[in-house]
């Protein structure tokens, strides 16, 4: 059994305060989930986050982690930014949604969404209705995503083998 219902992690820095927006929406919907949040090394607990913590008792917040695999494995579902963490969720077969912080992340988000591996919420700071729809679907267990073997965690080994082949010839 998973320890948390939802893990939220937005990388090293939440430049657009997306976490505050997500927590506000969770609060608006009066959603009862066991939450875990990884702030990232450069993200601080803002007054809005602290206020949410006082009202919501099923929440664990950590500043950072050295074991993302353990954190992702302990949850049923995730929300993350469109960077490296998307590959970690995919490798561990944990369904997730992507919120984009920067333009370059939209490509990854669209690709995961097209393959039905993740939900692409895009730039929620521009259209927060997407997070409302997503949270409703999550609470009603209406999110069905493919479990993919697309990412197996062995890419660096394959690359190093190819480099060694090139060096030997």
Mark where each language-model region is.
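Nucleotide-activated sugar donor-binding and catalytic core shared by glycosyltransferases
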Residues: 1-169
């Amino acid at each position: 059994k998973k320890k948390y219902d939802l893990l939220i992690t937005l990388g090293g820095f939440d430049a657009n305060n997306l976490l505050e927006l997500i927590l506000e929406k969770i609060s608006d919907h009066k959603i009862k989930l066991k939450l875990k949040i990884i702030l990232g090394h450069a993200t601080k607990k803002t007054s809005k986050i602290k206020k949410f913590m006082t009202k919501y008792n099923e929440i664990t917040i950590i500043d950072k982690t050295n074991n993302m695999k353990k954190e992702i494995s302990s949850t049923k579902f995730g929300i993350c930014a469109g960077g490296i963490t998307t590959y970690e969720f995919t490798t561990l077969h944990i369904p997730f949604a992507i919120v984009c912080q920067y333009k370059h992340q939209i490509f990854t988000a669209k690709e995961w969404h097209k393959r039905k591996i993740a939900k692409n919420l895009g730039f929620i700071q521009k259209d927060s209705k997407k997070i409302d729809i997503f949270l409703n679907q999550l609470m009603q267990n209406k999110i069905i995503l493919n479990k993919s073997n697309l990412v197996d965690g062995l890419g660096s080994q394959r690359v190093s083998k190819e480099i060694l082949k090139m060096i030997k010839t």
